[in-house]
């Protein structure tokens, strides 16, 4: 292997650790601490719990995401929306299509709700480690919340500057973090090697059989070790499948060694309350404060990765017309994935601080955490099974069914959390889900209410108006499709006689591929009437002005339609409010404001 190849090989692994594995990598801070608070720390119980953790990582993260999900992609991109795009080509319109679409909406909503709980529990659990510093054990919970809230505030405030430069440090910090986890775990295992027996799955099965219903509900806390596993698939488009997979093997080994080490520490120190921090303080008191600082940095990186992930999901949702248009800023010239959505950023900050104030302790937050994750995993499992059953990879169907069944078991165990704060997962997910459902239904309703003309009918009147006289220059008119003429265009050209020497109908079509841009100019649709189509991937960022210039279109004025919705229906009223609060099509695509003319059409719904 050449030197350059070695650099890219290790460089990809290091970057993946920083951008993809922050969430799952910080799970050891709180997972075992929460489980032990609910379970008696006998040797048999500890062996069973550690075995459950190890096999949860193997089945739900490695098998479901690293092996199965990552084999399904579109131009290297992954995630719930990509799974839907793959499935849409395989099924006919009807009930199945509606079912798949709803599953996608639900999966996206759950992931967005998860984006609130993850930063809150990660930062709060790291800050709680300060209580083990000599002299700081008396810090009040209010002080800890204030510190955690301040860290969250700084994290969100700096989002608009972009994380491009800072992201370079994320990888090395997370490499250091995983090395520290592996080292501390190995030291602890060496003092009690009997814990290695937990690798055998029979201890996990034995624990579930001997503990009955309480043992089954322990699964709702065990799932905390796998939170962030979905990032392997959702974020693989940023760095590629191979670097993410390679990094996962290192991360998996580090996590397993650390969980085994924590298990060994509990067996020898059954009274320990905060397991990871207690283990580190016992092993190396002098290095405890540096480790605590590293922990806080790791949780900030984990939160950052999740915030970027939410931005990415929202952007995909906008471009697939699942979500309303929002103001998007691009913070990096190198990385297409580096975007900033201000409205989402500030909403996340408010909700993260609210969650910290409501739950106060990371142990309480753990009661709400996990439901959204298992819900997302079940949805991924169902969609993967549907895809594999329709391809040549039918041998993967039993594996996909197996992981989906395991996902369902974890989801059922998490229902126990609903009365104890788990309902927050549903509340947080219900808001984006309601917006998605109202927006998609509203768009369909609006299209039917507008009653657009077909091109042939429009041309009969247009040709007559064009002969009478026209304005010098080029006029641009935004439409969804050339052959479907919206009412505002009829009002402009036919009723108001606003016809230019050259009239160009411009449409932007988002393809079901993640990236790629092509423009098509079709001259002579009518006399002095051309069509200009921009085809762009649903994650693609492009410059409209540049594309117009490249195709020789020197516009004098740009027209677009604005719908004024009149309705007594409460759902359509909400839809109308969303439309008014969010940017319109031309604002979203950053069309030059000086040349814009909005034409209002009153629509009754």
Swiss-Prot record:
The record's subcellular location field reads: Cell inner membrane
Species for this entry: Pelobacter propionicus (strain DSM 2379 / NBRC 103807 / OttBd1)
One of the record's GO molecular function terms: symporter activity
Q: What membrane topology is annotated for this entry?
A: Multi-pass membrane protein
* Database matches in PANTHER family: K+ POTASSIUM TRANSPORTER, OSMOTIC STRESS POTASSIUM TRANSPORTER
Which keywords describe this protein according to UniProt? Cell inner membrane, Cell membrane, Ion transport, Membrane, Potassium, Potassium transport, Symport, Transmembrane, Transmembrane helix, Transport
Reaction catalysed by this enzyme: K(+)(in) + H(+)(in) = K(+)(out) + H(+)(out)
Function recorded in the entry:
Transport of potassium into the cell. Likely operates as a K(+):H(+) symporter.
**HAMAP family named in the record:** Kup
Query: In its UniProt entry, what is this protein called?
Result: Probable potassium transport system protein Kup
This protein's gene is called: kup
Q: Where are the transmembrane segments?
A: 18-38, 46-66, 97-117, 138-158, 169-189, 204-224, 247-267, 287-307, 339-359, 368-388, 395-415, 418-438
GO cellular-component term (any)? plasma membrane
The coiled-coil segments of this chain are none
Query: Its principal location?
Result: membrane
Family under the similarity heading: Belongs to the HAK/KUP transporter (TC 2.A.72) family.
């Amino acid at each position: 292997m050449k030197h350059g190849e070695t650099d890219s090989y290790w460089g990809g692994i290091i970057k993946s650790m920083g951008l993809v594995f922050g969430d799952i990598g910080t799970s050891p801070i709180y997972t075992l601490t929460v489980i032990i608070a609910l379970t008696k720390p006998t040797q048999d119980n500890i062996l069973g719990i550690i075995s459950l953790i190890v096999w949860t990582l193997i089945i739900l993260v490695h098998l479901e995401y690293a092996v199965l999900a990552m084999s399904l992609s579109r131009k290297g991109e992954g995630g719930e929306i990509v799974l839907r795009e793959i499935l849409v080509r395989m099924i006919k319109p009807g009930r199945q299509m509606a079912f798949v679409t709803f599953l996608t909406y639900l999966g996206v909503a759950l992931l967005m709700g998860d984006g609130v709980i993850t930063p809150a529990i990660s930062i709060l659990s790291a800050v709680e480690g300060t209580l083990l510093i000599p002299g700081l054990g008396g810090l009040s919970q209010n002080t800890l919340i204030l510190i955690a809230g301040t860290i969250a505030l700084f994290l969100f405030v700096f989002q608009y500057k972009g994380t491009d430069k800072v992201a370079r440090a994320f990888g090395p910090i997370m490499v250091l973090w995983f090395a520290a986890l592996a080292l501390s775990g190995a030291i602890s295992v060496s003092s009690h090697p009997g814990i290695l027996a937990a690798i055998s799955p029979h201890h996990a099965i034995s624990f579930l059989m001997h503990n009955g219903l309480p043992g089954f509900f322990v699964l709702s806390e065990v799932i905390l070790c796998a939170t962030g596993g979905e990032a392997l698939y959702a974020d693989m488009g940023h760095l590629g499948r191979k670097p993410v997979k390679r990094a996962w093997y290192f991360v998996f080994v580090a996590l397993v060694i650390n969980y085994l080490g924590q298990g060994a520490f509990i067996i020898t120190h059954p009274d320990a309350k905060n397991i990871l921090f207690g283990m580190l303080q016992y092993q190396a008191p002098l290095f405890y404060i540096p480790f605590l600082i590293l922990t806080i940095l790791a949780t900030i990186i984990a939160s950052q990765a999740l915030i970027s992930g939410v931005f990415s999901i929202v952007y995909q949702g906008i471009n697939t017309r699942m979500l309303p248009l929002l103001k998007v800023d691009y913070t990096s010239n190198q990385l297409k994935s580096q975007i900033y959505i201000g409205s989402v950023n500030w909403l996340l900050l408010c909700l993260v601080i609210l969650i910290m104030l409501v739950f106060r302790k990371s142990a309480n937050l753990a009661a709400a955490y996990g439901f959204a994750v298992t819900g997302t995993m079940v949805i991924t499992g169902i969609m993967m099974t549907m895809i594999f059953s329709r391809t040549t990879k039918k041998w993967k169907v039993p594996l996909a069914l197996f992981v989906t069944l395991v996902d369902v078991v974890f989801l059922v165990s998490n229902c126990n959390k609903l009365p104890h704060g788990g309902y927050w997962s549903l509340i947080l997910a219900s808001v984006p889900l309601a917006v998605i459902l109202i927006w998609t239904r509203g768009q369909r309703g609006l299209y039917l209410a507008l009653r657009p003309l077909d091109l042939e009918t429009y041309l009969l009147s247009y040709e007559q108006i064009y002969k009478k006289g026209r304005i010098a220059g080029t006029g641009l008119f935004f439409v969804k499709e050339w052959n479907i003429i919206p009412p505002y265009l009829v009002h402009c050209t036919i009723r108001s006689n606003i016809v230019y020497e050259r009239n160009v109908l411009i449409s932007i079509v988002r393809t079901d591929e993640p990236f790629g841009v092509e423009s098509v100019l079709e001259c002579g649709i009518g006399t002095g009437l051309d069509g200009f189509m921009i085809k762009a991937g649903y994650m693609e960022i492009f410059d409209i002005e540049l594309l117009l210039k490249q195709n020789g279109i020197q516009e004098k004025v740009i027209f677009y339609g604005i719908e004024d919705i009149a309705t007594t229906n409460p759902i359509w009223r909400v839809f109308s409010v969303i439309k008014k609060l969010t940017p319109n099509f031309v604002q979203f695509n950053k069309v030059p404001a000086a040349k814009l003319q909005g034409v209002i059409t009153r629509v009754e719904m």
